[in-house]
Regions:
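Bacterial lipoprotein signal-peptidase II cleavage site
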Residues: 26-41
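Bacterial N-terminal signal peptides that target proteins for export
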Residues: 2-13
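C-terminal motif of bacterial Sec signal peptides marking the signal peptidase cleavage site
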Residues: 21-25
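Segments of small-molecule ligand-sensing domains
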Residues: 340-344, 362-437
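Extracytoplasmic "Venus flytrap"
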Residues: 51-91, 113-121, 144-146, 210-215, ...
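Extracellular/periplasmic Venus flytrap/periplasmic-binding protein
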Residues: 118-129, 134, 169-284, 321-325
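Extracellular/periplasmic periplasmic-binding protein-like sensory domains
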Residues: 281-355, 362-368, 445-448
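Beta-alpha junction/loop-to-helix N-cap segments that form part of ligand/metal-binding clefts
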Residues: 33-34, 55, 81-88, 100-173, ...
Length: 450
């Protein structure tokens, strides 16, 4: 599972667009199969003029007669702010698959279960067991790498295909033939973050990082790039033992130790712990414009801090910045399904593409069984150098003509490689404005070296 740690970079675009995120936890009692409305509801999408449906699975459906999408996504816990866009991506994909005629004659539906977070693994353990019994065609999730590592064996041992839209831990590269992801490994984001920091002229870097697979893995690859570019890590380096446990709430000692190392930039690698860390950094006089965040905490802090506190701080987020048409479709579906306005798009495109690729794999293989999805997943992503197509309907038409395809969806990822990772992916570079809201400033594309 060890991968080469270098990456090749191409600057693609620059501009400004507000990334609006919410830290509010999202829990829904009717997101799963039980107790949910099994009758689709619909609304008209202003952007696409299509009828959107909320296609939850009815009781008793399995992959034998339905393209059944299971989900283990954060409805609760310290990554719950990622739940709405990921669920919207799954739901929109299922809706559009059904609008295009389903999967090889079968209807599509989804069953959503809670992943919780790494502070209580019993939640994801129970959800994985529930979905094994439900016999889905594919399971989308989890958001957290640590959470996926907790239950991935439960799914793969049952020959159920798992696709994460947000896992970045390098430990998951090539983990199992039944595990895929549409998010890039930390080799890519770490290279982007380390390059950003040193390009900004900073050479002495401190990491305030939690002891989590995601945090330590991304720290390691960011540190490697910083050091390769002539910088040094003065606090929180790999092997120094400065990590704090997930769920910690006070950070006076960690911030004091980091500042005593006299860094000229600080990277915060945490989830919900980031808010008290920011407060402590500010209380001890740190210049917050020299602070860097990542996908786990690159959030809208407009309701958390005084205006201007984070202005100039920067961060990275895996994924392309989707076009407005796709965002409008996500917003419309979420309003249809949840009656709420979607404000966060993080990993929405990756979740959507994860489902579309799975459905296309089922079409190519002629079955909605999960083993068929696994056998054809990489091929429909372009691993067999097929003809490019950008919608489910267009890709199905090519498959029905006997052609190989390369689905190119809104996430912008390259074909799935032999490690079941994207062969290339985008990383967004963001900067905080005076309202403490991150705005996209540029996008880079990276690919792990072979």
């Amino acid at each position: 599972m060890n991968r080469s740690r270098s990456a090749t970079w191409v600057k693609l675009m620059a501009g400004t667009a507000v990334l609006s995120l919410s830290l509010a936890a999202c829990g829904s009692d009717d997101s799963g199969e039980s107790g949910g409305d099994t009758s689709p509801s619909a609304s008209e999408s202003d952007s696409s003029q299509e009828t959107l449906t909320n296609d939850k699975c009815a009781g008793g459906t399995t992959s034998a007669d339905t393209f059944k999408v299971g989900g283990i996504l954060p409805l609760t816990g310290n990554l719950a702010f990622l739940g709405p866009p990921e669920i919207a991506g799954v739901g929109l994909a299922v809706s559009e698959i059904n609008a295009a005629g389903g999967v090889d004659g079968a209807d599509a539906c989804y069953q959503m279960e809670d992943s919780g977070d790494s502070t209580d693994m019993s939640v994801s353990t129970a959800s994985a067991g529930t979905l094994v019994s439900a016999k889905p065609s594919v399971v989308i999730g989890a958001a957290s790498s640590s959470v996926s590592l907790n239950f991935v064996d439960t799914l793969t041992d049952a020959k159920i295909t798992q696709v994460s839209p947000a896992n970045t831990a390098v430990d998951l590269s090539g983990y199992d033939p039944f595990y895929f992801r549409t998010a890039p490994p930390d080799t890519i984001q770490g290279n982007a973050l380390g390059t950003l920091i040193t390009s900004d002229g900073y050479q002495r870097v401190a990491f305030i990082v939690f002891n989590d697979t995601y945090g330590t893995g991304l720290r390691n690859y960011t540190q490697e790039t910083i050091e390769a570019n002539g910088g040094e890590v003065v606090y929180g380096a790999k092997g120094d033992g400065d990590e704090f446990p997930a769920g910690q709430t006070t950070f006076s000692a960690e911030v004091t130790a980091a500042l005593n190392a006299k860094p000229d930039a600080i990277v915060v690698l945490a989830f919900d712990e980031s808010t008290p860390i920011i407060k402590e950094l500010d209380a001890q006089g740190w210049d917050m414009s020299k602070t860097y965040f990542t996908d786990g905490n690159l959030s809208d802090y407009s309701d958390s801090f005084d205006p201007g506190l984070l202005e100039g701080a920067q961060g990275t987020l895996p994924g392309n910045d989707p076009d407005e048409g796709f965002k409008d479709r996500l917003i419309s579906w979420y309003d249809t399904a949840e009656g709420e306005t979607l404000k966060d798009f993080s990993y929405g495109a990756e979740s959507y593409d994860a489902v579309i690729l799975a459905a296309l794999a089922a079409v190519k293989g002629g079955s909605t069984e999960s083993t068929t999805v696994q056998q054809n997943y990489a091929a429909v992503s372009g691993a067999t150098d097929g003809e490019e197509c950008t919608t489910y309907a267009d890709c199905v038409a090519l498959l029905e003509d006997g052609k190989e395809i390369r689905y190119a969806g809104p996430s912008g990822i390259g074909p799935i490689n032999k490690q079941n990772d994207p062969s290339s992916a985008f990383i967004g570079i963001y900067s905080y404005n005076s309202d403490n809201v991150p705005e996209i400033s540029s996008v880079v594309e990276g690919a792990p070296a072979s």
